[in-house]
Amino acid sequence: MEFKHTSVLLDECIEYLNINQEGIYVDGTIGGAGHSSEIYKRLGEKGCLVGLDQDSFAVETSIKRLDEIKSNADFKVVNTNFKNIKSACSGLGINEVDGILLDLGVSSHQLDEASRGFSYQHDAPLDMRMNTKSELSAYDVVNKYSEQDIYRIIRDFGEEKWASRIAKFITEARQNEPVETTYDLVDIIKKAVPSSARRDGPHPAKRTFQAIRIEVNNELGILNKTIEDCVDLLKRGGRLCIITFHSLEDRIVKMQYNKMVNPCTCPPAFPVCACGKKPKAVLINKKPIVSDIRELDKNPRARSAKLRVLQKI
């Protein structure tokens, strides 16, 4: 089995990480080591790359690919979620780093591997776990959550207009027999979404699948704390690069970045700051960096990618 994944905004990430040959860099979502390979190539003898991934197959693949690169730099790959970035680095004797990269997209490998159940384009058991050792699966969400909870997830995490109908149709369908596969779920969603709404736009199941995946992996719940931990871990002048793929993630990253840049909680009417909270960082790019037309031609999945960069002060 091969780990297939095209790295998004690769050149931009390398540029904005502003790599120091002797620095320490963390790729919190190493995947197939697409971004990490280019970081690693730019490190000298005293440099170090740390990779994290909760997918054990990604860990195995990234180690093999990094081993193939001729470099005097050191690298370490840890099988863990990026929410554990501080403890993972501490376990390696690392207390501060020069740069951190987080690519929040599901890898092409995970989407294309039908058995993982991420894709509405392949029939597979409902799974969607990025960490296959996790207990909660998409099957559990679809078959065990209440109609109200399913509605809330699809509405909030999928921003789906037809969330109420989809939740109702799911709970009605499972009364007859469990919803076991991705195609079972797709069929239910297609019945729930009016035909007029299915004619235009993305696949009718796209937003619901996104929402369930976010719930299964607690993707948004861990993001706020992770950003705080990343900034704490950075040296002064170190940079945090985060790539998002949907508006919910991007909104969280933007808000957390703004808190780091302007943490003051004083009322606007106050002439001077009285809360004493000092900025921890500056924005490198006020607007998100997006893929150019050349990258979009090669990799359509990059269309929704946004890169935001923060520098610790």
Curated annotation (Swiss-Prot):
NCBIfam families (alphabetical): 16S rRNA (cytosine(1402)-N(4))-methyltransferase RsmH
Enzyme category, top tier: transferase
EC number: 2.1.1.199
Keyword rRNA processing included in the entry's annotation: yes
Compartment(s): Cytoplasm
Reaction(s) catalysed by this chain's protein: cytidine(1402) in 16S rRNA + S-adenosyl-L-methionine = N(4)-methylcytidine(1402) in 16S rRNA + S-adenosyl-L-homocysteine + H(+)
Segments crossing the lipid bilayer: none
Protein residues bound to S-adenosyl-L-methionine: 33-35, 53, 82, 103, 110
Matching SUPFAM superfamilies: Putative methyltransferase TM0872, insert domain, S-adenosyl-L-methionine-dependent methyltransferases
Record's GO cellular component terms: cytoplasm
Keywords assigned: Cytoplasm, Methyltransferase, rRNA processing, S-adenosyl-L-methionine, Transferase
Protein name (database record): Ribosomal RNA small subunit methyltransferase H
Keyword Cytoplasm listed: yes
Family to which this protein belongs: Belongs to the methyltransferase superfamily. RsmH family.
UniProt cross-references to HAMAP family, sorted A to Z: 16SrRNA_methyltr_H
GO biological process: rRNA base methylation
Coiled-coil segments: none
Biological role: Specifically methylates the N4 position of cytidine in position 1402 (C1402) of 16S rRNA.
Molecular function in Gene Ontology: rRNA (cytosine-N4-)-methyltransferase activity
